[in-house]
């Protein structure tokens, strides 16, 4: 990591306007140069694009629907809404903590870079290498999981229309068809990422619009249909429990409902990944991160209440869960809205997931680019290259290749791929905990100041973030079915352990000289860019790079 060192890479700063002023880049390129990096990515995105990257990565609609039935089986309705009430404020505190860090260090490396900084001079390199592998694997897995989840909503239609085609995950022929569809979805999402920034910004807008349309339809159309068909659930149902995990303590079964509710907002760090492409990043990226999490929290509150009250009678509900092994929510929509009418609702959700995946590739590719820029990954020299539009297209290709390979794991065994669901979330959650831990104990008084500051709440929020994310990781590591067998074993701890070992191997094999020395925190203060002569010189140098290397974005 070239934090405050002389970068050997010669980069360009691409901008959308040829008359860019020094004042517009003084808190972006100047801060980036003080972190040791020359600007290479385009910087054309504003608040909305930054906000949309995290808003789509979280997408509470897809997150809730994807695992809603699991919560009903582990603890029941009361466990679901109670754990949600507990989880959402704690997730928002975590988002606020990460947003404060993002404001101080707005770089594409995001969690990797922040963890390195939080680790201090003594442990920064070690923590940075481990977290780098955590988050790269997590975000790459996230892309593959999104594609697979989308296929589940597609094939969930077959039981509704009584198709004779098997949709059992134990059927290798079905898994082959599902794999092919998942790969096709991945290809579409990747191709969208080769659109120049000038036009790609519309993908951000469409993604947010589809999610909001999805929300509005569920808040208006669904309750109207339910009220005329079978009516809303009563208070007794909302207070009921259901422990369907076999021989396991009911208290722990209740806690496992956090598997659904504690991960609703995971992914808000996407705004940090695109920080180097965002104008006035010290403020804009942190605001985009927190407000996207807050917006998803508001939407998820309304939608969870609506879903719980709109569920069909219990005997019908559990029959729907059993009859549609791919995605019970599709059968729920069909029962409530009608066999034909529900298709429109499902198509809106599927489109939302496709756009979500495309924006997740944006975030993950920027992360890969930033980690490769510091030489942490294999083939770093190739991965850190950008195209004429200032986009890391080689990193996008890398995401495509790895995600495609991960999708192939579904061919021999459905169990292996199911474990990716936890593997995609756990490393990110542990990275949140690592950043908070480092700031609390390793760089308590040395971390750069933030423009978006939590003030006196900063330390308490860091402690809460650390403890909460550790608890969440324990939940995601736990078995989800009992007794534990080879078919239902949760491989997330095994995958996480392997990722950590790869991080340690990288730390041991890559010399510290190739990663450079650590930063001087006193010089990395995003609030300290005044009009002093030294800062003017840095700004003029950054402006010179920008003006001398402009490529018009088409």
Curated annotation (Swiss-Prot):
Topology term for the membrane: Multi-pass membrane protein
What is a GO molecular function of this protein? amino acid transmembrane transporter activity
Q: Name the major location.
A: membrane
Q: Does the keyword Membrane apply?
A: yes
Which InterPro entries does this chain map to? AA/rel_permease1
Q: Name one Pfam family in it.
A: AA_permease_2
Q: Where in the cell is it found?
A: Membrane
What are the record's GO terms for cellular component? membrane
Question: Could you state one GO biological process linked to this protein?
Answer: transmembrane transport
Which sequence ranges are marked TM in the entry? 68-88, 95-115, 126-146, 176-196, 206-226, 250-267, 288-308, 343-363, 397-417, 418-438, 457-477, 492-512
Q: Does the keyword field hold Membrane?
A: yes
UniProt keyword annotations, A-Z: Amino-acid transport, Membrane, Transmembrane, Transmembrane helix, Transport
Q: Which PANTHER family match?
A: AMINO ACID PERMEASE, AMINO-ACID PERMEASE BAT1
Which family is this protein grouped under?
A: Belongs to the amino acid-polyamine-organocation (APC) superfamily.
Name of the protein this chain belongs to: Uncharacterized amino-acid permease C794.03
């Amino acid at each position: 990591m070239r934090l405050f060192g002389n970068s050997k890479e010669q980069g360009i700063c691409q901008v959308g306007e040829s008359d860019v002023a020094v004042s517009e880049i003084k808190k972006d390129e100047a801060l980036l140069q003080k972190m040791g990096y020359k600007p290479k990515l385009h910087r054309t995105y504003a608040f909305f694009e930054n906000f949309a990257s995290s808003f789509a990565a979280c997408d509470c609609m897809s997150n809730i629907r994807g695992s809603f039935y699991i919560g009903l089986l582990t603890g029941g309705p009361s466990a679901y809404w109670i754990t949600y009430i507990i989880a959402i404020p704690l997730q928002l505190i975590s988002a606020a903590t990460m947003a404060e860090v993002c404001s101080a260090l707005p770089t594409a490396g995001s969690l990797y870079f922040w963890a390195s900084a939080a680790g201090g001079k003594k442990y920064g390199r070690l923590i940075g290498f481990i977290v780098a592998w955590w988050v790269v694997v997590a975000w790459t897995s996230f892309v593959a999981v999104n594609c697979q989840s989308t296929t589940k909503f597609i094939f969930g239609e077959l039981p509704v229309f009584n198709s004779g085609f098997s949709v059992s995950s134990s059927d290798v022929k079905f898994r082959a068809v599902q794999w092919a569809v998942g790969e096709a979805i991945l290809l579409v999402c990747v191709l969208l990422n080769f659109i120049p920034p000038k036009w790609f910004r519309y993908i951000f807008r469409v993604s947010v619009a589809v999610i909001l349309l999805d929300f509005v339809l569920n808040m208006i159309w669904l309750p109207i249909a339910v009220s005329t068909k079978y009516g809303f659930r009563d208070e007794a149902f909302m207070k009921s429990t259901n422990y369907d995990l076999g021989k396991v303590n009911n208290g722990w079964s209740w806690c496992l409902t956090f598997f659904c509710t504690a991960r609703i907002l995971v992914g808000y760090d996407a705004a940090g990944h695109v920080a180097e492409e965002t104008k006035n990043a010290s403020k804009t990226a942190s605001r985009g991160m927190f407000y996207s999490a807050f917006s998803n929290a508001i939407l998820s509150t309304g939608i969870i209440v609506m879903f719980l009250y709109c569920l069909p009678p219990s005997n019908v509900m559990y029959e729907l869960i059993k009859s549609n092994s791919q995605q019970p929510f599709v059968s729920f929509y069909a029962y409530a809205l009608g066999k034909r009418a529900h298709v429109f609702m499902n198509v809106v959700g599927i489109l939302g997931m496709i756009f979500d995946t495309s924006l997740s590739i944006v975030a993950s590719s920027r992360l890969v680019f930033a980690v490769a820029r510091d030489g942490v990954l294999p083939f770093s020299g190739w991965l850190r290259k950008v195209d004429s539009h200032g986009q890391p297209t080689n990193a996008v290709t890398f995401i495509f290749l790895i995600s495609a390979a991960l999708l192939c794991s579904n061919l021999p065994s459905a169990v292996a791929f199911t474990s990716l669901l936890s593997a995609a979330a756990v490393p990110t959650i542990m990275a949140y905990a690592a950043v908070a831990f480092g700031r609390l104990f390793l760089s308590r008084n040395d971390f750069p100041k933030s423009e978006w500051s939590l003030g006196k709440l900063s330390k308490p929020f860091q402690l809460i973030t650390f403890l909460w994310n550790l608890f969440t990781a324990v939940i995601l590591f736990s078995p989800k079915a009992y007794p534990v067998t080879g078919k239902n074993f949760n491989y997330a701890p095994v995958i996480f352990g392997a990722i950590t070992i790869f991080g340690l191997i990288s730390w041991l094999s890559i010399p510290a000289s190739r990663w450079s020395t650590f930063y001087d925190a006193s010089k990395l203060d995003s609030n300290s860019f005044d009009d002093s002569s030294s800062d003017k010189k840095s700004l003029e140098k950054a402006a010179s790079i920008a003006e001398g290397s402009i490529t018009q974005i088409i």
